[in-house]
């Protein structure tokens, strides 16, 4: 009888069970992000960002961290660090190609729209791509090496940098989860205090909108829970009440223009002043500390509501 061929190593981690809950919440996060970027949408008054410091971005990045632990963890566990790093490198290359492809597709699509619609100025006005149009060859070279990260094209570069940190975190975590946590927190501290920055364009000091060294904290929080480096939180009434209280208190001061920002419910100057005072710790590009606390509180409430099998 012929021997059954051994499964190819590339297929091992792909066979790990997918958690449909992650796909659901990532899809929900993407849908909310879409609503947030639709101009003049009445639905944008009701997205999570209007009622708290964190928003759908945290949901998406956290779930991406958990999904990455499922997708790549087995490669590191069963075949070693180098094989796992190879899998990560392959994924980075896939995401990089998608990043370049989407940019070219957007340029082509909006360029065609401008040619067909007199007076339309999507590329310069809406997308702020004037520098690319003025020097396409130079800017394309800068774009390919992440020295030029235009508006709306910063999500995938952030994801690529965070993915590149996975082998480092795995090496540390396999020795001690505390080492991985210390490394992640140190990176976050450097980024959230503006000590670690990446420039988004060569002619100014504008940083990437999403600092990957700050946002890796929420990514690796999801990663750590899925890997088992972090235990499931205890189900305690006091902790639930504390989380609910924090969510309730943060809602009125979550936006510059008062409660719910753009809902047209009136502007309260005092709430706006409090928001401005809190800005260093709720800053989105550098993932301020209160954004993290708010997300953890929201996640804990969701965890409790989901029940024992949640």
Task: Report the location of each language-model feature.
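Alpha-helical transmembrane segments and their immediate juxtamembrane cytosolic regions
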Residues: 2-310
């Amino acid at each position: 009888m012929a021997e059954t061929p051994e499964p190819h190593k590339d297929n091992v981690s792909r066979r790990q069970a997918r958690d449909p809950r992650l796909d659901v919440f990532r899809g929900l996060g993407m849908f909310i992000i879409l609503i947030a970027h639709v101009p003049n949408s009445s639905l944008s008054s009701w997205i999570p960002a209007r009622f708290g410091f964190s928003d759908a971005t945290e949901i998406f990045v956290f779930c991406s961290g958990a999904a990455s632990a499922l997708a790549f963890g087995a490669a590191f566990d069963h075949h070693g660090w180098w094989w796992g790093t190879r899998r990560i490198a392959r994924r980075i290359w896939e995401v990089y190609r998608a990043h370049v492809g989407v940019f070219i597709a957007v340029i082509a699509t909006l360029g065609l729209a401008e040619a067909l619609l007199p007076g339309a100025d999507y590329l310069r006005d809406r997308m702020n791509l004037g520098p690319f149009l003025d020097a396409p060859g130079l800017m394309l070279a800068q774009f390919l090496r992440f020295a030029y990260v235009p508006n709306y094209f910063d999500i995938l570069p952030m994801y690529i940098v965070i993915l590149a940190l996975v082998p480092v975190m795995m090496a540390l975590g396999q020795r001690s989860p505390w080492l991985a946590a210390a490394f992640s927190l140190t990176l976050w501290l450097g980024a959230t205090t503006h000590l670690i920055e990446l420039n988004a364009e060569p002619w100014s000091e504008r940083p990437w909108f999403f600092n990957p060294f700050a946002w890796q904290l929420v990514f690796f929080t999801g990663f750590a829970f899925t890997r088992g480096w972090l235990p499931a939180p205890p189900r305690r009434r006091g902790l639930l009440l504390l989380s609910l209280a924090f969510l309730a208190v943060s809602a009125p001061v979550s936006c510059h223009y008062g409660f719910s920002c753009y809902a047209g419910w009136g502007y309260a100057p005092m709430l706006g002043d409090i928001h401005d005072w809190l800005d260093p710790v709720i800053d989105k590009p550098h993932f301020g500390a209160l954004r993290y606390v708010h997300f953890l509180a929201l996640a804990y409430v969701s965890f409790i509501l989901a029940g024992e099998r949640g």
